[in-house]
C-alpha cells in the first residue's frame, strides 16, 4: 500500500516539475518551414514572387530554410515541419523530385507550375486579393501559433521629428475618440538627442501612447546603404536608449525586406521579435543555394490603404499604413473608408515580444510593458514640464508596480494547491481501497 502511494506522489511531483519546462520548450521551438524554389520570378515578369512567399511564410512564426531546386536533400524534406514549393518555370522540377515531394503531401503546399495532376496554388502575384488568399492557405496549413485571429493593425507611418507634431496629436485624438488603437512607426534618432526638437518629438510620441498607440522603431535614415551591421546596431542602440530616457517605449522594429536576405543583418534582426516589413520594389535578384531566416513572434506585412479592394476577411497579420505627413482631411477620409469596409483594427498592445538594442531590454507581454524587468506605464501622458520637473518618475513607476497584484503568481499557487489536493485525494482513495479489501476478506 505504501509503495503505491509513494509512486503516485512521485508521479504528481514529477509532473509539477516537468510541466513548465515542457510548456517553455513548446513555446520556444518554432520549427522550420522549408521553401524550395527554382527561380525568384517568372520569366519576363518583374514581380519577385519568392519575396512574397517568404514574407508570407514568416507570418506563421516559423524559421525559414530557403533552398533552390538543386540543393535540397531527402533529409531536408524529412526534417522540415512544413514544405512550400515555388515553381516559377515549367519543368524545373524532375518527375522524381515531384514524386518525392508529394509523398509528403500532408505537409506540402505547391505554389506555381506543376506537371502533375495534384492540387497547386496558381501564380498570380499581381492581384493583391489573390496574394492574401494564398497567405491564408499558408497560414491554415502551417501556422500552429496559439493566436490565429485575423489581426490587422493601423499604422501612422514614417513619423519624423520635423513633421507637424500638432497634426500627429490631432490624429491621435481622432483615433482615440473613435476607439481605434494604432501603431506609430517613429523614425529612430541617434544624433542631437538633447535638442528641443527631440524633446518635442518624444513628447508627441508619449501623447500618442497615452491615446491608445504603441510605438515601433522606424528605420534610421542612412546616408550610406553599405553601413556595417555593427554600426547599424550601435545607432539603433543609441536610439532605443534615448527613447527610454524620454519615457518612450518601442516594442518592435520596421525593416526593409532587403534585410531578410543579407547575412550581415542577421544579428541586427535578432534584437527584435516584432517586425513590420516594408516592401522594396527594387529588391532585385534573390538567388541562394541555402539561406536561413529566423522566426519572429510577430510579423506584419505593410500595405497601403489604397490596396484594400477586397474583403476584410483576408486581412491577417497586416499593417495598414497611412503616412504621418498626410493632411488631416485625407487621414480622416481613409479611416472612414476602412470603417466602411468593416475593418476592425486589432489592439497592438497584444503584440507580445521584446526589443533588445542598447543597454535596456523592453518586453511587452500580458504582464504589461516592462524595461529590464520593471513595469513602466505608457498609458499616462507625461508632458515635458512634468518630465523635467519630476526628478524620480522611475521610482514612482516602481512604487506603482509594487501595488499591482501579480495574477501569474496567484495562478501558480492555485495550480500547486489544486495538484496537492489531487494528491491527497488519491492517497485517501487508495487507503479506502485498502480498508475495503480488509473488510471483504475477513
Where are these regions (language model features)?
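Cytoplasmic C-terminal tails of single-pass
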Residues: 437-442
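Alpha-helical transmembrane segments
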Residues: 422-436
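Short, charged N-terminal beta->alpha structural module
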Residues: 31-66, 263-264
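C-terminal domain-boundary segment and adjacent tail
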Residues: 144-147, 173-193, 273-285, 322-415
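Sec-dependent signal peptide cleavage junction
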Residues: 20-31
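Metal-dependent polysaccharide deacetylase catalytic core of the NodB/CE4 family, i.e.
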Residues: 33-38, 176-292, 320, 353
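A glycine-centered loop/beta-turn motif at secondary-structure junctions
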Residues: 29-33, 76-88, 97-151
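A short, well-structured beta->alpha microelement
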Residues: 53-79, 300-308
Amino acid at each position: 500500500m505504501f509503495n503505491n502511494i509513494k509512486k503516485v506522489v512521485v508521479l504528481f511531483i514529477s509532473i509539477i516539475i516537468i510541466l513548465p519546462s515542457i510548456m517553455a520548450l513548446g513555446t520556444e521551438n518554432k520549427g522550420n518551414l522549408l521553401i524550395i524554389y527554382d527561380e525568384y520570378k517568372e520569366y519576363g515578369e518583374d514581380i519577385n514572387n519568392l519575396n512574397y512567399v517568404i514574407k508570407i511564410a514568416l507570418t506563421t512564426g516559423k524559421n525559414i530554410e530557403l533552398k533552390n531546386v538543386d540543393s535540397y536533400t531527402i533529409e531536408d524534406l524529412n526534417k522540415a515541419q512544413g514544405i512550400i514549393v515555388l515553381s516559377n518555370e515549367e519543368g524545373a522540377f524532375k518527375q522524381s523530385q515531384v514524386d518525392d515531394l508529394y509523398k509528403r503531401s500532408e505537409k506540402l503546399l505547391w505554389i506555381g507550375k506543376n506537371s502533375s495532376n495534384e492540387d497547386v496554388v496558381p501564380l498570380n502575384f499581381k492581384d493583391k486579393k489573390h496574394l492574401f488568399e494564398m497567405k491564408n492557405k499558408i497560414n491554415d496549413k502551417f501556422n500552429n501559433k496559439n493566436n490565429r485571429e485575423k489581426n490587422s493593425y493601423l499604422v501612422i507611418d514614417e513619423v519624423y521629428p520635423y513633421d507637424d507634431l500638432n497634426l500627429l496629436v490631432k490624429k491621435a485624438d481622432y483615433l482615440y475618440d473613435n476607439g481605434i488603437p494604432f501603431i506609430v512607426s517613429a523614425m529612430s534618432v541617434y544624433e542631437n538627442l538633447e535638442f528641443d526638437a527631440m524633446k518635442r518629438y518624444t513628447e508627441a510620441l508619449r501623447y500618442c501612447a497615452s491615446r491608445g498607440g504603441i510605438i515601433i522603431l522606424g528605420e534610421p535614415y542612412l546616408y550610406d546603404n553599405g553601413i556595417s551591421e555593427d554600426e547599424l546596431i550601435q545607432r539603433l542602440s543609441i536610439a532605443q536608449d534615448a527613447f527610454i530616457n524620454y519615457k518612450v517605449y518601442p516594442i518592435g522594429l520596421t525593416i526593409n525586406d532587403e534585410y531578410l536576405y543579407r547575412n550581415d543583418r542577421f544579428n541586427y534582426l535578432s534584437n527584435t521579435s516584432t517586425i513590420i516589413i516594408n516592401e522594396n520594389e527594387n529588391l532585385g535578384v534573390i538567388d541562394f543555394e541555402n539561406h536561413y531566416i529566423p522566426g519572429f513572434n510577430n510579423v506584419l506585412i505593410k500595405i497601403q490603404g489604397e490596396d484594400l479592394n477586397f474583403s476584410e476577411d483576408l486581412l491577417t497579420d497586416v499593417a495598414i499604413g497611412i503616412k504621418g505627413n498626410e493632411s488631416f482631411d485625407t487621414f480622416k477620409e481613409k479611416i472612414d473608408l476602412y470603417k466602411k469596409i468593416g475593418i476592425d483594427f486589432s489592439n497592438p498592445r497584444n503584440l507580445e515580444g521584446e526589443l533588445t538594442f542598447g543597454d535596456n531590454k523592453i518586453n511587452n507581454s500580458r504582464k504589461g510593458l516592462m524595461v529590464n524587468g520593471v513595469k513602466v506605464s505608457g498609458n499616462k501622458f507625461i508632458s515635458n514640464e512634468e518630465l523635467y520637473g519630476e526628478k524620480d518618475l522611475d521610482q514612482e513607476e516602481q512604487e506603482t508596480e509594487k501595488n499591482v497584484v501579480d495574477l501569474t503568481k496567484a495562478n501558480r499557487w492555485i495550480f500547486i494547491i489544486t495538484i496537492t489536493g489531487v494528491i491527497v485525494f488519491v492517497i485517501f482513495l487508495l487507503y479506502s481501497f485498502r480498508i475495503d479489501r480488509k473488510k471483504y476478506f475477513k
